[in-house]
UniProtKB/Swiss-Prot annotation:
The gene is argS. SUPFAM superfamilies: Anticodon-binding domain of a subclass of class I aminoacyl-tRNA synthetases, Arginyl-tRNA synthetase (ArgRS), N-terminal 'additional' domain, Nucleotidylyl transferase. A motif ('HIGH' region) lies at residues 126-136. GO terms for biological process: arginyl-tRNA aminoacylation. It is found in: Cytoplasm. One of its GO terms (molecular function) is arginine-tRNA ligase activity. InterPro entries: aa-tRNA-synth_I_CS, Arg-tRNA-ligase, Arg-tRNA-synth_N, Arg-tRNA-synth_N_sf, ArgRS_core, DALR_anticod-bd, Rossmann-like_a/b/a_fold, tRNAsynth_Ia_anticodon-bd. Keywords: Aminoacyl-tRNA synthetase, ATP-binding, Cytoplasm, Ligase, Nucleotide-binding, Protein biosynthesis. This is Arginine--tRNA ligase. Pfam families: Arg_tRNA_synt_N, DALR_1, tRNA-synt_1d. It comes from Trichormus variabilis (strain ATCC 29413 / PCC 7937) (Anabaena variabilis). Belongs to the class-I aminoacyl-tRNA synthetase family.
Amino acid sequence: MNATQEQLKVKLEQALIAAFGDEYAGVDPILVTASNPKFGDYQANVALSLSKKLGQPPRAIASAIVEKLDVSEICETPEIAGPGFINLKLKTAYLEAQLNAIQADSRLGVPTAKHPQREIVDFSSPNIAKEMHVGHLRSTIIGDSIARILEFRGHDVLRLNHVGDWGTQFGMLITYLREVSPEALTTANALDIGDLVSFYRQAKQRFDADEAFQETARQEVVRLQAGATDTLHAWKLLCEQSRQEFQVIYDLLDVKLTERGESFYNPLLPTVVEGLEASGLLVENQGAKCVFLDGFTNREGEPLPLIVQKSDGGYNYATTDLAALRYRIQKDEAKRIVYVTDAGQANHFAQFFQVARKAGWIPNDVELVHVPFGLVLGEDGKKFKTRSGDTVRLRDLLDEAVSRAHADLEERLKAEEREETPEFIDKVAEVVGISAVKYADLSQNRTSNYIFSYDKMLDLKGNTAPYMLYAYARIQGISRKGGINFADLGDNAKVILQHDTEFALAKYLLQLGEVISTVEADLLPNRLCEYLYELSKKFNTFYDRNQGVQVLSAEEPLRTSRLVLCDLTARTLKLGLSLLGIQVLERM
């Protein structure tokens, strides 16, 4: 809800009490944005909801509310429409004052959260000795955008990368490398990441087929857990090599993370089991220690347990996740913990959240949120893979997007007979390519699957990153064409609204805070994408020579006023795109 809506809501609540008494304090006035501008800007529907309780027709209730409603500083005289809707139209002077205020505000009128708190966003989380693939794309960029929005709202955000850096796979890989490439276990970067991944696959095949190899691999895991010097050194080298490769991707995507892998929680795993035992939740079932869950059954309809210690004494993902959760609440003092993973893990989160609640580990003031997302599909509607059927490497996907953006730009420059330096072309292609991939993902409702299409995401038309970047660059072009520095307009430059397209743009600019606040609550970045796309369209209509207004050739004071609207649009686009992890371009 934006500042204007907040004010109107308070005024309506006061009018309700004045008209019908104190018992109506706290009644929701049901204030919504008007669906049609001809009915005003906002509509309160509370009269219809109170008709039965008050035993009066909705129009009579609406009249009684309007009689006590004092919104003269904000709105024109309220009107009652239809069965009892209260329509509110913002005054031009009020709109102008609001725009002048955000023009002087570096945050564009977006307030910080009333109660800032420590929040954790757990995202990306690739596995050591494996390359990041298209499956990591969504977690990484959705998590990054959520973290950026929470940070902008003033929360203290810890961005955690829960890397898969522990487990049986290391015993398997180290055992295999001792045979085929022992130098990789003693020397940094003896292998490139592609070879490491290939050896991992070969090790897995050997592990599945050879019992003697399996036994040796398990002994290697025991040595690792016991801290054997050579095995621990080998493990650290393998982790560091993968870490370097991950960092290349994170740098390309401009994503910041604090790594805290599964191994970090190893010393805490026994205390998880002890804690569950002490709370009376732990049951031994076929030698394994587990907790039975409410609402989860197997195919036979029998209660489904969450295993926290295997019959051989080993631990699993659930144990690690429970240890991590306790640490994040007790040591990190997080008040909201957000996990960004694919929707296929929804049951896992529901299960270990339930166990933690039953154990009393989650205080009432701590919120746990699983942020699920759908699959990335190929244009055939199936899971996105290479032609050979392999999973698409994330690095290859990003490189291809940049390469295509490069080719598109060179083609456009040729058509425009325009010359640019190779450095300019490379920079623009990288920003456009990476931004296109990010925006194509973030603009979808994250709970849905989406089809990955280079052609669509790189299109200069439609709800795409290139369209947004072009809208921003176009406004910077206006300043260059007019020889104007927007920063020099100054806080004294006043907005004057006359034309319909000016009003439409102005009202939309004032909705940014409401949109960001909504995304903070529901963690759906596509809402911000929709807002920025609509804003770009409204600006293009405002600037259109047939539908809109003259800007540079307008007489003063309208010229300066319209330049302020241009500047506010550009700043809103820049801020909004930055919260999606997208940088803008002054020229394209």
